[in-house]
Design a protein with these regions (language model features):
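Beta-strand-rich ligand- or partner-binding modules
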Residues: 199-295
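Collagenous Gly-X-Y triple-helix signature in extracellular proteins
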Residues: 1-211, 226-227, 236-238, 273-278, ...
Length: 295
């Protein structure tokens, strides 16, 4: 596995964003720990669909904004939505907005300030017209930015990758290119897909229940010692031989005093319920647990 931030700009990341999560599309790594501190910005490699900009040239809560922040966002896998970062940026004529998914601004697309307003930061990938060219159904096509050009027109990226606003009325239909940011600690699968894209490696988990063995006398306290990495959640009981053990929340390497004083089985037994989840890029492991029983 590899950190997403270890991949070069332009690397393709496979994301399901259509057909209720069944369809697949590629997003390109456009920015690493630059516009979004600690984040990687992913931009759809090609155009999602065509849409109007809105009823006017202000992006917030218009047709394009609602399509991206609601419709497309809701088609993303829940595990990916959980990782998306809140991104705040300024828009000329609208001020600051915060979104988990958004259309690129004039500045993000590499065109500089929009009417004197820095609309976020230039994304590292977009340094030429060629880098901004996107296709719809295999043909290069224009796509909307979230930027106001004037009271009449909105900015877009033309089929050749250049910026254009004149004649682009908000009621016109142009391409939709969503973007979002996820933490740079997100992991990718080792093997690439046939088209060279990589799949995101979602949180893994180790879960197990361990009976540490029977004892004659009632254990009143115990010291669990768990050697592992990742985020550990631990439960313990002193009647693990019972059909329904009394599980109690415990802390690793901390003496636990049992609240339970009863059992239905012939003998007492200390049991552990161990759950470990990945926190970043670590390879999960769990060594054999140890428990010191106290009578």
């Amino acid at each position: 596995m590899a950190l997403i931030s270890s991949k070069p700009l332009g690397t393709l990341i496979r994301v399901a964003d259509s057909d209720g999560g069944e369809g697949a599309a590629n997003y390109e790594i456009a920015d690493i720990n630059n516009f979004v501190s600690g984040g990687v910005v992913l931009v759809r490699k090609n155009i999602y669909s065509n849409s109007a900009f809105g009823s006017n040239t202000n992006y917030p809560n218009g047709t394009l904004d609602n399509l991206i922040k609601t419709t497309i966002y809701n088609k993303m896998p829940q595990q990916l939505r959980d990782k998306m970062m809140d991104v705040t940026f300024k828009l000329s004529g609208s001020g600051d907005i915060t979104r988990k998914m958004f259309a690129l601004t004039y500045t993000m697309a590499g065109f500089g300030n929009n009417s004197g307003v820095a609309e976020g930061k230039a994304l590292q990938l977009y340094t030429s017209n060629a880098s901004r060219v996107k296709t719809l159904n295999g043909s290069a096509a224009s796509w909307w930015l979230s930027a106001r050009g004037s009271s009449d027109y909105a900015w877009l990226v033309g089929a050749d990758g250049s910026a254009s606003s004149y004649g682009n009325y908000p009621s016109s239909t142009r391409g939709v290119v969503p973007a979002f940011a996820i933490p740079q600690s997100v992991m990718l699968e080792d093997s690439a897909n046939t088209d060279g894209s990589y799949n995101i490696k979602y949180t893994e988990k180790i879960s197990c229940t361990v009976n540490m063995g029977s004892i004659e006398e009632q254990p009143k306290a115990a010291l669990p010692i768990i050697s592992c990495n990742g985020n550990l959640t631990l439960k313990i009981c002193n009647n693990a031989n019972d059909a329904n053990p009394a599980w109690e929340t415990a802390a690793n390497e901390t003496v636990h005093n049992f609240a339970n004083t009863t059992k239905t089985a012939a003998q007492w037994a200390i049991g552990l319920k161990i759950d470990i989840t990945r926190t970043a890029g670590e390879n999960l492991f769990l060594n054999e647990p140890v428990v010191l029983a106290m009578k």
